[in-house]
Amino acid sequence: MLLGLHHITALAGDAKATLDHASQVLKLRLVKRTVNFDDPGTYHFYFGDRLGSPGSLVTFFPGFKREAKRGAGQIVSGLDLSQVMLCENDPEPTARLLGILGFTPAGIEGNRHRFELPDGAARVDILHEPQTERGKMGSGAVHHLAFRVADEAEQLEWRARLIEAGVHVSPVKDRLYFHSIYFREPGGVLFEIATDGPGFLIDEPEEALGSSLCLPPWLEPARESIEARLHHDHRIQLLELRS
């Protein structure tokens, strides 16, 4: 069973402005400064509660100059993790996938279709907007939504279940702080199922979370070139980020 939401990841513009907004306006703790493991020239900032607990996490890929265009096939609300909202031209295919994931219908209000996990562990709303054009990714858009599972064994069970249902699912990806599988819902939104562990304390103590640029072991040999690229692309001194 899915335990709820694990995290939500958004695209952002200026890296320093993203850090300031999340910490000062959203009042979130920066628990990890790292990079996008699939694109090490892009920062990946994790914000959450004191320990970065699953379900508290909002993460950002900064550096996107083009602004997003709201539209169908996007998550249009959800940075607070309490009410994730998708915009779809046709809600039925997405509703069927949510059913496979264990969500059940929880009511319709106007063009909003609500789905919930048992005991209210997570809620997803689908806005039915049949005439809305497809959205475009860019700064301000949500990149993907991740659901929680307890461990890798349960994650593999979900992967097999989704494949059996005809869903194209990625292999398991090692994200160091958790393991992930990815798939798209019929409208195009990227979903993820992530494990609760190992967590963010594997490479920094609690009091130092988010204080330095952390890289996974397989990227550590390239640290110098990665830091140089980050500085060049984002125009931010690493010392500024540590302040």
Predicted regions, residues:
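Conserved donor-binding loop and adjoining core beta-sheet/short helix segment
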Residues: K32-F37, F47-G71, S77
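Surface-exposed interaction/gating patches
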Residues: L81-R159, I163-V169
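C-terminal functional regions that serve as terminal interaction/effector modules
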Residues: F147-R175, H179-S243
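Core segments of cupin and vicinal oxygen chelate
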Residues: L11-S53, L86-R123, D174, S243
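N-terminal beta-strand motif that seeds the catalytic metal site of vicinal oxygen chelate
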Residues: M1-A17, A72-A95, G138-R148, E206-S243
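Short, structured motif recognition centered on aromatic/hydrophobic residues
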Residues: L5-T9, L28, F45, G55-V58, ...
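A short local loop/turn or secondary-structure capping micro-motif enriched for an aromatic residue
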Residues: K65-A68, Q131-R134, P198-I202
